Structure formats: C-alpha cells, structure tokens
Amino acid sequence: MKQCMDAENLHRRLRTIVGQVQAIDRMVDEDVPCEDVLAQIHAAKAALNKCGGVIMQGHIQHCIRDGLQHGDADRIIANFAKAVERFANMN
C-alpha cells in the first residue's frame, strides 16, 4: 500500500484531522454552541473523505494499473468495485 500513495501527504492530512477531532473534544467541555461543534465535525468528515480520495487515486494509478497489466482483470475490477462502494457509503 505504501508504494501506491503519497504517504507524506496522507500523514500531514491525518495529523490535521487528529487536531480537528481534539479541538471538537475540547469544544464539548467549553460550552461552545452546537452549530460551531457541528461545523467542526463536518470539516473533520470532509478531511477524512479527502484522505480517502487521495488513497483511491493512488490505488487507481498504481495498484489497479499494475494489477491489470500483470494479473486477473476480472478479480481486480471486482475488488475495486467493492472498494469504491465502501468508500461511497462512508458519507
């Protein structure tokens, strides 16, 4: 998996998400208005979705391409379809 994605980019994004979630946790204790907490939750979810997109892009560009060139195309496509379905259902 490491070879098919920009790990540095992903780690940077994930650190940002960790910071967002920690901030949301603090907001709960600080009596921040619900609307503001919900806005931050939305931002964290969007950032996670972006991470999924980065992983999906790397998977297509490297793993799928390599698998189609050197493997069983039907199996590769079926596995990819399942991954896309799972990713699409995360929202």
Regions found by a protein language model. Give the residues of each.
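Solvent-exposed interaction patches of small proteins and small membrane subunits
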Residues: 1-91
